[in-house]
């Protein structure tokens, strides 16, 4: 245990040294603060001033000409022509300058501002009122602005980055986990760290339970921490925080639940390793997320945002639905409804199948996006699978990934039974063959006795 902890500390120190070496060739402010904060130019002494640049201010700002405000405002109502019956008079009027104030043949009507009531309420007489602005939109269409703004907030999220603008991934950007070298390196390392035990857990199941629980629970916690930290921190800070917390959990994953969470002191799972409970709940939330995305497609989310009119509240509702479904599946797994052996086999097979498929899908997506410029990616890895925008949808590639997960899970459960059935058939054939040999030997012995008798 001490050796493992020492090795994990060595790994963390090595990663920190690597980051410091990288920062020598990169801008630290860009890496850590998305270039929004500068340590070295914080004081006002480093700010550039116009008078220090020796630039004439007239090149920076050009003043506007004098404008006849009455003509400008009356243009909103239109111009009322009077006494222009001859075409020559009209041509003369067109050659006038806007700065002229003595215009005898033009009536300038007083401009009256629309009030709030007449602007938003439906009023059929608005268009007939000469005192209101002509050319304004129909108030009926203005009433739908609230709905349009809500739809804009949904499709084009409040965040400044354009990559959050699609509720369904349409391939107009490369997701962050495929575009940032730190995230690619970190996720690839974690998959490499667990890939061997994933295949062993898929084939052998509970016979490799100790190492499986230790590493796979750490992998699930890694994705949870990374998903949360990317919301609040830049990529490199998220990687550092995620590594520290992940390897801390690695050191306590085999501890009993009662030593970590005192709420489990009187429950039936108090002696179970905390890592095993994490794996069982991860399996529950994976299935729960599939059910949630089936019950709540993007059209349902649009209905939610239209009537709730609060994007954050909609996210909380969606998260509550996922957690509710997941807790139902979790309590179903730890109850006595299913035999414990079958439930354990299903957890091993399903979690192994999901992580194996997500591992290959992640590297395949990198190859598609970075080398083939193809955006038909699989949204099955945890970061994209549990995403509000872009949302997981049941398109062809995602349906194929889900089919592979469930097919591998069923095959992992059925394969040992088929193997056992073949072994039983082989044993039966051996027993029949051995019995035939015994009968042949007995008959031969009897024949020898008869021959000896005659001799």
From Swiss-Prot:
Effect of loss of the gene: Gene deletion results in fertilization defects affecting both male and female gametes. Fewer zygotes formed and ookinetes developed. Lower infection prevalence and fewer oocysts per midgut in Anopheles stephensi mosquitoes after infectious blood meal. Does not affect asexual erythrocytic cycle. Does not affect virulence in mice. Does not affect gametocytemia and sex ratio (female/male). Does not affect gametogenesis.
Membrane topology type: Multi-pass membrane protein
Main localization (coarse): other
Glycosylation site residues: 41, 102, 125, 373
Record keywords: Cell membrane, Cell projection, Cilium, Flagellum, Glycoprotein, Membrane, Transmembrane, Transmembrane helix
Cellular component annotations (GO), alphabetically ordered: motile cilium; plasma membrane
Function: Plays a role in gamete fertilization. Required for the successful transmission of parasites to mosquito.
Protein name, entry field: Membrane protein Pbs54
């Amino acid at each position: 245990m001490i050796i493992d902890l020492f090795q994990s500390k060595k790994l963390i120190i090595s990663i920190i040294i690597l980051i410091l070496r990288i920062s020598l060739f990169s801008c630290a402010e860009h890496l850590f603060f998305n270039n929004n904060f500068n340590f070295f130019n914080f004081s006002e002494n480093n700010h550039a001033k116009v008078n220090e640049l020796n630039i004439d201010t007239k090149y920076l700002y050009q003043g506007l000409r004098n404008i006849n405000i009455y003509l400008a405002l009356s243009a909103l109502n239109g111009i009322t022509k009077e006494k222009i019956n001859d075409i020559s008079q009209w041509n003369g009027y067109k050659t006038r300058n806007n700065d002229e104030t003595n215009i005898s043949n033009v009536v300038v009507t007083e401009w009256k501002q629309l009030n709030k009531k007449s602007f938003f309420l439906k009023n059929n007489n608005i268009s007939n009122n000469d005192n209101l602005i002509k050319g304004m939109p129909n108030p009926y269409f203005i009433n739908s602005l609230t709905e349009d703004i809500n739809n804009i907030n949904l499709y084009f999220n409040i965040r400044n980055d354009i990559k959050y603008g699609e509720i369904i991934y349409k391939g107009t950007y490369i997701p962050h986990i495929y575009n940032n070298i730190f995230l690619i390196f970190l996720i690839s390392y974690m998959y490499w760290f667990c890939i061997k035990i994933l295949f062993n857990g898929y084939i052998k199941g509970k016979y490799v339970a100790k190492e499986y629980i230790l590493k796979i629970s750490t992998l699930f916690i890694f994705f949870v921490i990374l998903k949360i930290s990317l919301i609040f921190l830049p990529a490199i800070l998220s990687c550092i925080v995620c590594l520290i917390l992940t390897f801390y959990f690695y050191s306590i994953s085999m501890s009993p639940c009662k030593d970590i969470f005192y709420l489990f002191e009187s429950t039936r799972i108090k002696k179970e390793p905390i890592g095993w409970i994490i794996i069982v709940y991860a399996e529950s939330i994976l299935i729960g997320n599939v059910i949630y995305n089936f019950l709540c497609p993007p059209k349902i989310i649009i209905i939610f945002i239209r009537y709730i009119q609060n994007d954050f509240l909609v996210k909380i509702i969606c998260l509550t639905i996922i957690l509710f479904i997941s807790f139902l599946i979790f309590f179903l797994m730890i109850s006595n409804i299913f035999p414990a052996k079958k439930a354990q086999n299903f957890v091993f097979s399903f979690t192994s199948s999901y992580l194996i498929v997500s591992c290959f899908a992640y590297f395949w997506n990198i190859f598609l996006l970075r080398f083939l410029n193809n955006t038909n990616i699989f949204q099955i890895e945890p970061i994209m699978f549990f995403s509000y925008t872009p949302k997981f949808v049941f398109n062809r590639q995602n349906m194929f990934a889900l089919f592979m997960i469930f097919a591998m899970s069923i095959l992992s459960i059925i394969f040992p039974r088929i193997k056992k059935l073949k072994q039983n058939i082989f044993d039966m054939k051996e027993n029949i063959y051995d019995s035939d040999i015994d009968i042949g030997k007995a008959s031969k012995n009897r024949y020898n006795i008869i021959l000896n008798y005659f001799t």
